[in-house]
């Protein structure tokens, strides 16, 4: 039962789409287990650049079946627009399904997101304002609407649920935020229309995946966001609303941990994050700006500039251990090409005391002083290199040192956005 999990080892935006796309060339099924349209995965092919949000990265292979799992919060209009846009540019797509157990981002969820961020002002989380957090809040509070609730034949129960839910939302809109209420009839009609449009895609996804595994099919689970945004183990409260870890990937995809034999952690050769929250290695100088511009570090979904910093091996090792990574992919190595020296954060200090892992309390994490190891840069173009052995010795040393620090073999190295710009290495070859 070959299941591979691809997940982010940092704060998201590590290049998981590129790695999933590469692995999906020989996979039967790709499942998206978590997140929502707030995530963005980029795939570059000979046909151009494809920016995916909720649809798995394997969709560009006609042989690949793609599934949006139960752990995803689905915005029906965003999903329908995304699939239509893909069909216009790439007519030969893989098959696409959506779990009937996935929760729905309803029209009131983005409004709640927006109004709450406004209310918080400078203390805001920095969300993408897509309604992701409010949708997952309703899920955990057991008052969410699921895909199954929208389908034809469920109109009576759907209206009853909305009649129960909407007064609470409107109370918040009117009395907390000073905004206009939503109309029940309009909301019901919108949801019913969504259900009709979604119906051809809806399946019992967990049953489909388990049947495929029983038949010997290969499955990739493509997690969204990154481990350091996990609501339990990340920089809470500056986190996402669903688990981007290996455990969360299993839960959202309907796969048992014992069915997983490969966990690929994806890391950038430097570090980025979007929005507020602790970021010990952040660069606010010209070096940071150079990396941001070279790496086009602007959000796939929001277009917001990403914060940029040196590689944080403390957070990366924490992530590798937490997820039980069997191997790692290191992306965007070529973005560091011009630098005369590169730094790796090898330790944390707080009040002159060494800290071996990210602190749980966000205030303590914000007080971390990074301990750096300085390595020489390579100052030459690596984007045309086709094997690891052809990289400059300084670049090889940088990769090997990261591998040593995180304790996981680096088997893939990205030196550009295209499919061909991956250097493949057997596990353990760098040590």
UniProtKB/Swiss-Prot annotation:
The active site is at residues 13, 41. IMP binds at residues 13-16, 38-41, 128, 142, 225, 240, 304. Homodimer. Gene3D superfamilies: Adenylosuccinate Synthetase, subunit A, domain 1, Adenylosuccinate Synthetase, subunit A, domain 2, Adenylosuccinate Synthetase, subunit A, domain 3. It catalyses: IMP + L-aspartate + GTP = N(6)-(1,2-dicarboxyethyl)-AMP + GDP + phosphate + 2 H(+). Its main location: cytoplasm. Keywords: Cytoplasm, GTP-binding, Ligase, Magnesium, Metal-binding, Nucleotide-binding, Purine biosynthesis. This is Adenylosuccinate synthetase. It holds the Pfam family Adenylsucc_synt. It comes from Thermomicrobium roseum (strain ATCC 27502 / DSM 5159 / P-2). Its cofactor is Mg(2+). PROSITE patterns: ADENYLOSUCCIN_SYN_1 (PS01266). GO terms for molecular function: adenylosuccinate synthase activity; GTP binding; magnesium ion binding.
């Amino acid at each position: 039962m070959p299941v591979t999990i691809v997940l982010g080892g940092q704060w998201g935006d590590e290049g998981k789409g590129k790695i999933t796309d590469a692995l999906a060339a020989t996979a039967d099924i790709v499942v998206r287990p978590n997140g929502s349209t707030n995530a963005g995965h980029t795939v570059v092919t000979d046909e151009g650049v494809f920016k995916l949000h909720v649809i798995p990265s394997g969709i560009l292979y006609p042989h690949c079946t793609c599934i949006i799992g139960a752990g995803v919060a689905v915005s029906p209009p965003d999903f329908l627009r995304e699939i239509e846009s893909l069909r216009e540019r790439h007519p030969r797509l893989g098959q696409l399904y959506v779990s009937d157990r996935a929760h729905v981002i309803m029209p009131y969820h983005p409004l709640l997101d927006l109004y709450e961020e406004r209310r918080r002002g400078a203390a805001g989380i920095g969300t993408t304002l897509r309604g992701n957090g409010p949708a997952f809040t309703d899920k955990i509070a057991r008052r969410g609407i699921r895909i199954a609730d929208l389908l034809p034949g469920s109109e009576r129960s759907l209206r009853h649920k909305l009649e129960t839910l909407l007064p609470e939302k409107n109370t918040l809109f009117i009395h907390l935020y000073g905004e206009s209420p939503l109309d029940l009839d309009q909301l019901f009609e919108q949801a019913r229309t969504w259900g009709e449009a979604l119906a051809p895609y809806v399946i019992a996804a967990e049953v489909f995946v388990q049947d495929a595994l029983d038949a010997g099919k290969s499955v990739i689970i493509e997690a969204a966001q990154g481990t350091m945004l996990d609501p339990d183990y990340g920089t809470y409260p500056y986190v996402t609303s669903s688990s981007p870890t290996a455990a969360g990937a299993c839960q959202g995809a309907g796969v048992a941990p014992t069915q997983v034999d490969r966990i690929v952690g994806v890391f950038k050769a430097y570090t980025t994050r979007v929005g507020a929250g602790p970021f010990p290695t952040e660069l606010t100088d010209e070096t940071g700006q150079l990396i941001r511009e070279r790496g086009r570090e602007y959000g796939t979904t929001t277009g917001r500039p990403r914060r940029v910093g040196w590689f944080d091996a403390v957070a990366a090792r924490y992530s590798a251990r937490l997820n039980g990574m069997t191997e790692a992919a290191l992306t965007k190595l070529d973005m560091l090409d011009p630098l005369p020296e590169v730094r790796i954060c090898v330790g944390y200090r707080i009040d002159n005391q060494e800290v071996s892992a990210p602190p749980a309390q966000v205030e303590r994490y914000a007080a971390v002083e990074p301990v750096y190891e300085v390595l020489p840069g390579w100052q030459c173009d690596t984007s045309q290199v086709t094997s690891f052995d052809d990289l400059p010795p300084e670049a090889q040393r940088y990769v090997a040192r990261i591998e040593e620090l995180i304790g996981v073999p680096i088997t893939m190295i990205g030196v550009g956005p295209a499919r061909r710009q991956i250097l493949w290495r057997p596990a353990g070859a760098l040590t």
